[in-house]
Amino acid sequence: MSAKTKHHLRDRKVFAALLRSKRRFFSTFLMAYFMPNRVRTWRAAVSISKTKYKLAVERNLIRRQVKAIMREQFCNLNAVDVLVIINQGFLELTFKEKQTIFLNLCQKLQELDAPKPK
């Protein structure tokens, strides 16, 4: 089962805005840029550099795993755009370790989504 089209992020203007955004999540194996959007659902894009992973098979495996984790953990997020950039070494992690990294990212995104106290 693939991620729904409404969760795909493809607009270059949004990519540029995400990269300029001050809201970031850094991990050893990935960087995530995020910001609120006007759509009522979360949207995500995964970027994997050819210089870090030469084989398309590896890049596709990473992309499938990341999308599976996002579908599982981002289900209760609202109105946020996320750009995930994968770094070297991500492929060597176990699936459970990858889930832990994305769980931390999801908690950070829920803080963004939560109403601010007055």
UniProtKB/Swiss-Prot annotation:
RNaseP catalyzes the removal of the 5'-leader sequence from pre-tRNA to produce the mature 5'-terminus. It can also cleave other RNA substrates such as 4.5S RNA. The protein component plays an auxiliary but essential role in vivo by binding to the 5'-leader sequence and broadening the substrate specificity of the ribozyme. This is Ribonuclease P protein component. Its EC number is 3.1.26.5. One of its GO terms (biological process) is tRNA 5'-leader removal. GO terms for molecular function: 3'-tRNA processing endoribonuclease activity; ribonuclease P activity; tRNA binding. It catalyses: Endonucleolytic cleavage of RNA, removing 5'-extranucleotides from tRNA precursor. The gene is rnpA. The keyword Transmembrane helix does not apply. Consists of a catalytic RNA component (M1 or rnpB) and a protein subunit. Keywords: Endonuclease, Hydrolase, Nuclease, RNA-binding, tRNA processing. Transmembrane segments: none annotated. Belongs to the RnpA family.
